[in-house]
Design a protein with these regions (language model features):
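A structured, charge-rich N-terminal accessory region that forms the first stable segment of a protein
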Residues: 2-76
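Long, hydrophobic/aromatic-enriched structural stretches that serve as scaffold segments
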Residues: 60-98
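Aromatic- and glycine-enriched beta-alpha-beta binding-site module
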Residues: 82-154
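A short acidic-Thr-Gly-centered motif at the start of a beta-strand
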Residues: 96, 201-203
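Short coil/turn motifs at helix boundaries and re-entrant loops, enriched in small/polar
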Residues: 108-109, 211-215, 221
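Short glycine-rich, low-complexity/disordered patches
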Residues: 124-134, 227-238
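Aromatic/basic-lined ligand-recognition segments
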Residues: 137-201
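Acidic/histidine-enriched, beta-strand-rich ligand/metal-binding domains
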Residues: 205-208
Length: 238
């Protein structure tokens, strides 16, 4: 971390990170271009083998969605991204983070290369390119990176102190919190032991849908004008 040892709360919110109708797929495991309409229930089949493959595909997609929402490690990562046709809207070059189907978070190469200079632990960035399902050709030569952010650490303190967070019980009977409104700078309390954290990017399982960013990574993102989509606010160390 940098000399100020600050910590920043961030979230891949739809207010700053746009969703695009893009399918993540693993071409080594499924022939997605050939069978995607069956996988996505656009076409029916009575073929037992295809029905079994469709079932596995759905299970993998469900796990991928859970990994993005709850920040756990998954082996079912895509090696390609697919759009239905050349008319499908693609992210503009000004967006360095975007979301795809299954809740996947995808970064541009420039943003991914910056993150790779920092301590990500077991979190991974998998290279993918976008293809057209109609032509099975690349939509562009650009390489993107699919983020599997799976590192978890617990540093949050006094979560019920001022009513900004709402508690609820998860399916696993664990207490978790969601944000009520917007968190202001310095409002969220984080244990000062976070200064010894060996990571620059992690999720705290107590707080749903958010990640934490070290001062060093925050400063690097700001320096290259890649901070706005993260919507980072500083925390207060206690």
């Amino acid at each position: 971390m940098s000399n100020t040892n600050n910590v920043w709360l961030a979230g891949f919110k739809l207010t700053s990170v746009n969703f695009y109708d893009i399918y993540p797929a693993n071409s080594k495991k499924y022939d997605f271009p050939k069978y995607w309409k069956i996988f996505e229930s656009r076409e029916k089949t009575a073929d037992p083998k295809l029905l079994e493959i469709k079932k596995m595909y759905k299970e993998d997609r469900l796990e991928l969605s859970g990994a993005g929402r709850y920040f756990f490690k998954t082996e079912h990562l895509p090696d390609s991204l697919w759009v239905e046709s050349s008319n499908t809207k693609l992210p503009p070059s000004s967006e360095y983070i975007f979301k795809v189907r299954s809740g996947g978070v995808v970064l541009t190469q420039a943003c991914a290369q910056l993150l790779q200079q920092f301590r990500l632990g077991e979190s991974t960035l998998t290279p993918v390119q976008i293809y057209d399902l109609e032509t099975q050709q690349l939509c562009s030569e650009e390489t993107f990176y699919f983020l599997n952010l799976c590192e978890r650490r617990e540093y949050l303190r006094d979560l019920e102190s001022d009513g900004m967070l709402v508690s609820f019980m998860t399916d696993e009977k664990a207490v978790q919190y969601s944000v009520r409104g917007d968190i202001k700078s310095g409002q969220l309390l984080v244990d000062q032991s976070v200064q010894n954290c060996e990571l620059d990017l992690w999720h705290d399982p107590l707080l749903m849908g958010h990640v934490f960013v070290s001062d060093a990574l925050h400063d690097a993102l700001v320096q290259v004008n890649m901070d706005s989509q993260w919507e980072m606010v500083s925390c207060q160390l206690v």
